[in-house]
Amino acid sequence: VRQVVTLVIAILLFVPVLHAAEPADFAKIAAAAKQENKVVVGIPPSADLRKQLDAAFKGKFGIDIELLAAPGPQNANRIASEQKAGVRYFDAIIVGTGTALPLAHGGMLEPIEPNMALAEVRDPKNWWGGHIWEDNLKTKRFLYSFIAEVGTGGLWYNSTLAKPEELRSLDDFLNPKWKGKMGLSDPRVPGSGQSLWSLCWELKGEDYLRKLVQQNLFVSRDLRQIADALAKSKLAITMGAGHSQYEPFINSGLPVKQLPAPKEGLPASNGYGVVGIVKNPPHPNGAKLFLNWLLSREGQEFYGKVMKSSTRRLDVDTKWLIAYGTQAAKDTLTLDDYNRLRNHLEDKYTTVRLPAAEFAEQILK
């Protein structure tokens, strides 16, 4: 008993309390997690996130965190295979839209709300739009969507070849002037190109996309290749490559600039902003500790800075992201506009994103 009390006191001294009203409960979770001494999380394929998250979490809690950085489908498929085989390795997963829905539907995830130990995390008033679920049709409890942004992977132009006033509407992209001069991130695979393509599919229809394809688009899954072509004036306009791809060219003074949003708007996204806890995690207290830290104000500030993404937390500043070509939905959109422009979350993913991607498969050969 004395050892447990000593451990709780040590955790209280070691861990800065995330919420002053509940130090005892959170300290118990942290103490139990420290006894497990490990948590395993599947994360997006970002070397920066893996390196900085390892240092931040281990440095704060003194607990080893194994981070498996890989494309979302790779981690999700591995979890599904292991769950079916009775293997318990992963504790939690962070992915983009749609990726983990089969896990939710297959009973392979834990409900999120019972694991929200911190009041600042549980309280929907701290979140723009309240609690938003990726699995928002039937279950509404397994996958929490903590990012909402607009503009990521948007529209860029070469300022020696195009002018913003020539591209005020999506219809302007059908001008014969741009034939053979536009690049698109491949909409047949998940990503920013698919998001833009899906918005066009929903707002403008399939005839519009047929005409767009007739513009002899340069379609690639290599965003760096698309950005390089724009910087070298091989393309005049690109769709789907983002600020991170263009930053080196901007710093070199090359003529690449982001287009203002067309009058129809740009798609709202939750980026790599969906978190779930795996069913019967091997380190249940570590999983709960990680979830609460990630969704806390501190965790959301950390994740946003590393990933250049926009949290939905109302107490975290996101206006600085405009310099990186991203705008937080909470800073720029009403909830009605957000729901009009988004093609993520299960309802839009199944009725817009998937059929739009299937149409892309048909007409992009």
Predicted regions and their residues:
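Sec-exported extracytoplasmic/periplasmic mature domains
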Residues: 31-38, 58-63, 80-84, 98, ...
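Periplasmic-binding protein-like
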Residues: 209-213, 218-220, 253-281, 322-323
